[in-house]
Amino acid sequence: MKHLYEVINQLSALESRLVEKEEFQRYFARCKQSFEEMGILYYSPLHEKYSETRTDVEANITGTATSSMVITQVIKPVIVENGAIVQRGIVIVEGK
């Protein structure tokens, strides 16, 4: 499965770079649906609130840590297989 997770990481990187190009969104949706049929979900926590109690991501904090932290960049997505996190997301977090 490790190779499959690497494919998901690459697909997620492409998706984040092509987010504004709507003609590609249909293909990404089809890929996600295929993974879901195999019991694998992946998501990007971009712009979500961050707290140190989150267990689904590993964060690198830039700037000063505050009580209002937000995920500003996703290096790797969170991958969940059959309800269990198999890859924690790697993210950059900034204080607001």
List the model feature ranges, each with a label.
Residues 1-18, 26-96:
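Extended, amphipathic alpha-helical stalk segments that mediate dimerization
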